[in-house]
């Protein structure tokens, strides 16, 4: 940065240059055109100095030209021949020595010809210039005036050629050369400066020759040597050119003859060396001879009289001039300058240097009067001698100067003195200060004598030291009438490098009391105190000014005029402004810039400097080039630079026109108009206001112009009800009055606000404000109405009053009557739900009656429910339409059922036959319309606009309902009716920011029967009903289910019901069907804590029993379409299931409002409640039951969508049930791969417990549907918990004891056997898991939570705590496989992610505990699990630890390293490599491009995510990624890749990626993205290749054509890491390393999963704290959107955005970066869970992975070395383009849905966010997120009471604040990632 000075200097330089030329540079004497600058204003007379000797110095000139700095000055050379000869030698010697930089301080001594011989080193060019004062008539005359002392700038004798020694001194206050110490001791210290004999070029010292003339040529030898003063700090290199006033000081560069120059001014009195630190070589004793005051004239020189006389003289001149010319001029402004110039008065010199060189004080001394140390007498030095010494440089001891002029000389005397006297004075700098030390400057500003310098000023001698010793010179007196004249030489505004010109002005420093006191102290230093007082009194009397008894204004006028010119710009305002540009301010700014430097702009700065360099002129050789133009001496470099600079365009000065100075002259072309314009014609005449017309005398009319009182124009009264204290409803009354002032037609507004309005009372507050024009008033009215009514969503009564008209009343939003109706309907629904629950319990025992009958019942019920819901959730018309659709529609309507008010959870359960909102919409168009209506209503309520995307056929539609639970949690239910069309409506319901999209899949559509749907709902209800028991039951049920699923697939749902019942019993009692009393007590306490009604609690208990039976049944029902109803019948008939699921959801919500958070159902159902323990929970439950009658297992299939044929599906489905449980628990988002019914998982942490598990996802791929419709995959929380807790028990041996040990925190959560820790058990579990994978078709889901152990990635994953080798896994029977997979997943999950990979080695107990913890504590209570290592709080540390490990783990660079947990999972990487190798054989998928760090961020969000399996359909072996220790590990998997992520105690969702690819499309779909930073979040996305569904994680599966797809959702509800373990049949179950803190990557399979589900997953991801969400636009089933969620808190998750089209070739993984570029997705990172803008925010995914279109043909291989996703054959761009297009479409849907549901998505993620935050702030965030969900859900739920809205708003605000706080905390970690 160039200092401000430089620019000013350039400009001033140009100005000075022109002035020089104008001012008589023509003088022959000034060969160089040394311009005499008239100093001061006065009369600027340029006096040409004529050098007496004609031969003056032509010869010298060429030499001078070399001197770059002062060529002009140098060339004016010495007139005397003697000077010539001297100069030649001195110049020749000096030229090589001249430093490139100008002498820092150059004092021009105009008057004194400097004789000093120039020392070779110090030789300075001496340029004598004799300036004849303008005042003198004879310019040539050598009158002393020409050497005005004012102008004399003594060359620094300091200027010593060797700058280095001097520099430090310069930095000190004293100039190095000057020994300012006045102390008598004359020490040789001065000699320090440089040992050069003071050589003053004896140039013009011709006393004899030319007499006066020679005297005039005072060659001021200015030091060209920069040394002392030249040192960077110091003096300006400018020579002052004496300005005309009479002082032309020829500034000759005076060779500082006294280079040694330690100058000490000796004060006769012992002045302490105040002046300087230098040598104190002043002999105080020697008194300067009287000759110092040599004027013969002893007469007192009255300075004030002289000034006054001169002023009057100038005044008379001005008056005469005015009389002659009529022009006024003020020539008397510079009276003092004129006087000094005329009288040649002695001055002190203050040099102001540019930049940081500071300012200095310089004193004159008489070079010709030297004190002889022996005799102690003054001896004049002979000038001639020194001149003769010219040849011998340095011989002369001192340059002789003519004696100092007497202090007060008359003009006549001064003239007579001829130049001898004054001009001889040398000048020496004695002190130097930085500008920060401005004491002297302040004194000068105040025109006061500086008392602290009095000793210096009074001193009579100056001692200078050089190599030869110290010489003491006489110092002329500077006092006149007690005042001192200071000559200010300002070098700051001139261009220092080129000239020695300075601006000079003179200031009269007057004595003050302080100086008087200082003098007394000095004079009376030896006197006693009494004498001192007497002396002081006399001095005070003598110096007191006379009293003026006749005041005269002329005195003031004279003072003003004499200062006029100087004070022009000296106003206080200007001075204040100038402080910004003082050197201190500039230094401060430079320092600031230095430390706030923006790195990376160095090149820009360099180019700027280059442009500022002057162009090299014709001197190409550089010989002539000045240093400025030739920056370097190297010709090569110079040539390069010049060629370069010529190419660098300079700033277009030509383009920028200079600003013309303003002129007061009229423009030349301005002329008076020819004809006068009649102003009156156009102006409007107003009669004067004081002369009112007759009509206005008595009083103005209302509209009279004189009336300044505003008149009322119109009024708006807005009234609404608000909740007041004690449940009282207060009237919120706002009156907006619009006034208009008749006088100026201005509109005014008045706003009156009364928050508790009562008729006739005015308790509110009002304010008035100006509106201006009518347009502004209208705009204000419109905006105010929109804001107050929340754009019409809020119920507000608006009354519009216009004087003289009838009032107009309008209403917005829901009125109280409507609200009451809705409430009544909700109550009815709740009652029905209770009935249904009872029926369901009965039905569970009963075999499923004909599915059709139940479906018809359900349809009827759905109609009823829909009607009821319509009241609850802004009119749900869809259910009616759905009823028409029958079974398929019913499946879809499950979501609606959940949507029913969950405030009364039990009541919400509808009759099993009636799926309240489940009935799928038969007619898409009709459904879409109601949905839109509902959405619009919801939007109005919430401010959030939900736009439903009907991408699929009109048949598919989703309805969303918000149900508010008694505990204050909102449940958002989205109904998605499975449509035959593959398109999935992407409806994002925004409930408190949670988006639930029911997934409609072609497969689901194909599954026409709704019984499976009913089953799923019932399971959900059961789970909801029994919080903890559900987990336990599910754990056991899954065991049973695994065994029974096969049976169920073959048999009716009855077996499923039995299994469910068993599972439920297991959950409640570990083994008993009935709920555990302890569990019930926990549930009760949870419900109480949630502020739920006791009724709800009772209902929940009932529901828990029902769910225990009913969950199993519901799961079974979901699994089997026909039989599923019967299965659910264990609690109720299939139709009953709906009710039961509602009741269960209600129970779940009520029991643990926060616990529900972020449990996505594999089907579209997603429940998110972030705050497990918080009463306000928004639970989004999407029940998508796929209508396929037989795909009860489809839900499980959803998990594991069989890559192979349907038969595979059946086994897979069984596995899926177990895996579903895991998914439900662990995955916030789960998508159903198949067309089967989908079930929702609810995980509620009443006390941090997981209460609800995913319901069975009935929907499976079509293949799956064909395989076993009857098979129900029941994912019950109990089963899931059991599996997670005790993998061995859950996995293969349903009979194996699953001791459901509920962790202390949550009764249900610890349903798993922690006993299983033993290796054999682990082996069993592994074997079961492996069995699942091996026996089951690749589709079979192996949900293996690999313990985070280093070995976890290995197939055996022994370290994981799966000690079971692959053999064991294969040994387990296929039938048990599903259970085994779950158990494996659970086992892995069981290893607490917090414990990290290290703990993962610990036995299964560990894993079980982790899973249990996860289950039990969704939020922060992970440790509560019985896991031995885990303390309840460990999960948080674990998460943090994971995050750290990810960040630090070096493994990130290579896939396996990232895949393997960086810490303990080294083994993982080899397995990864193997897997990669296996995959590589078929396809090359290079993951290097992928940035694992982002994945890690996403993974980190999933606390429990440990193993993610990526299965490429074409490959027999899936790739399993283990995230343990925060890293992904790839495990070689058998043919099936199952990703089971189990969150640690905190983790809420398990990522299960089941590759379901139709055999057709197995290869093409899967792309696994790994972020390069392997750290915790590499969830390497489970890559399950699903033909149409991208795997949830970073895996993008591109199903080429197969309708069946998988969704992999890695969700971490709890802060604890989620591990997504995907194990293939061949390989060990997932290697689950603990995942990143909280992130869920959900890559739903868009096609299979209903749009709602897909949306839920991405949204869930989005809601994760940090990360952008995965936005999946659901367009066609085939289209797949992959969004990976950017890591919640700490890490950016990989955002996979965009839909992957069904074409197998298109694999798009859009990295977060691309997303960010597109700004399609909002990253939740900053927003945290609270932001709605998910769609718009760019996701920070470091890499976009696009798999080439060839993916279908070529398998994707993850290279172990780098995580880059390379598509081997297909161009990435092509793929990206279609994908982008799809993404754009999806994103458009998403943006419609997400923006409306953006809030929803963020809340869906919030549970992951909670997971992330959970570690840090799990509970807070969950609460916030719940609140947020509730707040956002308001619009989504069609009917929300005003109270709910307010509660939601409050919750949302709270959450946002907390989220913001969390985000702030996380920002640093995010940045690091």
Curated annotation (Swiss-Prot):
Name any one GO molecular function.
transcription coregulator activity
Q: Where in the cell is it found?
A: Nucleus
Supply the alphabetized keyword list.
Nucleus, Transcription, Transcription regulation
| InterPro entries, sorted | Spt20, Spt20-like_SEP
Q: What is its main location?
A: nucleus
Keyword Transmembrane helix attributed = no
Instruction: Please give an example of a GO cellular component term from this record.
Output: nucleus
Q: What would be one Pfam family of this protein?
A: Spt20_SEP
Question: What Gene Ontology terms for biological process does this UniProt record contain?
Answer: chromatin organization; regulation of transcription by RNA polymerase II
User: Which family does the record claim for this protein?
Assistant: Belongs to the SPT20 family.
What is the recorded function of this protein according to its Swiss-Prot or TrEMBL entry? Component of the transcription regulatory complex SAGA, a multiprotein complex that activates transcription by remodeling chromatin and mediating histone acetylation and deubiquitination. The SAGA complex predominantly acetylates histone H3.
Q: How does it assemble?
A: Component of the Spt-Ada-Gcn5 acetyltransferase (SAGA) complex consisting of wda/Taf5L, Saf6, Taf9, Taf10b, Taf12, Ada1, Spt3, Spt7, Spt20, Sf3b3, Sf3b5, Nipped-A/Tra1, a histone acetyltransferase (HAT) module made up of Gcn5, Ada2b (Isoform B), Ada3 and Sgf29, and a deubiquitinase (DUB) module made up of not/nonstop, Sgf11 and e(y)2 tethered to SAGA by Atxn7.
The protein depicted here goes by the name SAGA complex subunit Spt20
